Amino acid sequence: MPGTKKLILVVIDGLTPDVFEAAAESRSAPTLAGLAEAGTYARATATFPSLTPVCLASLATGGAPDVHHIPHLVWYHRGEKRVVEYGSSFGAMRAVGARRSVKDAIVEMNAEHLARDAVTVYEALEDDGLVAAAVNVPCYRGRTRHVPTVPGVVRPVNGPRRFFYYSLFESDVTGAPLAVGGRAKGSIDAYAAAVGRWLVTRDGFDFLFFYLPDYDFASHALGPSGADEALARSDRAVGALVEAAGGLEAFLDRYDVVLCSDHGQTQVEQPFRLESALSDFRLFRPNGRRDDAELAVAASNRAGMVYLLPAAQVEPRAVAERLSEEAALDVVIFREGGDTIALREGAELGLGPDDNGWRGRARHALANPNAGDILVSAAAGVELTDLGGRHHVGGGSHGSLLDGD
């Protein structure tokens, strides 16, 4: 396509609008400031639940959760009668089986869980003869088979033609450092920067999805207003692309650039165990599961889901009304007949069919065939503990329908 510029999508995980705007204005993130000055800026809205696998699947497919079928960081697989855990924490991964969790996060999310008819941007572009590239993107399904760099860890996968995934999959030899050698100091973003520099130097793609997760990692630990050092590292990673092209002007002459986050973050002040509100039901246990279980609970960060199992002798409304009494929960959502119902403090909220705000996002989330029968959005300052009992109190989290998330 003569005259068509190539495109780079940069996603800085967990970067909030307030932090971005302050960094751009103060120029503490000079590359981001330069891009903001050269382009246009607007605030965007994440999907619900506003969690990385869900949001990145939406970015990769252009579809809402009811289209791509990724419902949460953790969910109950009705067909396989087990819990899928993509990595809420190491404790949560151990609770379901660490090897199984690694396989789900790296392989099965793309090979099996992502809807077959939700075409990814990599698939669409390469079907048209263009070269797609992805760096560290968890949602990567493409047309090209890739073998892992470490045999036996996971099986081969199908990704874009140029595919780099945390040193585990590398379509090309770039000389980039190991991605997992010091996460708190930005090792993953440093790996992405080295790979991105290599790609831009060779002009080796028509589309690049460039994903930087280290800011989110720091923000979980330090809070959204305390991760300035991590943002500076993310800025340098984007700067590596700019430098490889010969400076900002040359970079923007060659590429169109979209820079965004996948979701926001808000401060966490208290944990809440969703299972505690349902203790008089028989609950499914990820290890040592019980065949007489009535409910399965999937919770992490600031969103949760409850599944009614075949043994349950209760309607979704009864469970939802129980949950809506909890001060730790802001909104509880469920289906009744063909209607989507939302409860807040026991009162029913209207969900009009044409609402494009939080109500529309809630409907799309509940319509996902892998979602629970009841969805919950945590109240401000509350985080739902994961299967390992972990939370981010004192730091930041996300997942809810509230604006900051």
Question: What do the PLM-derived regions correspond to, one by one?
Answer:
Residues E21-I70, V74, A133:
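Short, structured active-site-proximal loop/turn typified by the sulfatase FGly-forming signature C/S-X-P-X-R
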Residues D117-A118, D291-D405:
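Active-site neighborhoods of enzymes that stabilize oxyanions during catalysis
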Residues G63-P224, A327, V331, D339-L351, ...:
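His/Asp/Glu-rich, glycine-adjacent segments
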Residues P53-V54, L252, E269-R273, L278, ...:
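Short, solvent-exposed loop/turn segments at the edges of secondary structure
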Residues A24-R27, P148-G152, G223-D228, P271-L278, ...:
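Short secondary-structure boundary/capping segments
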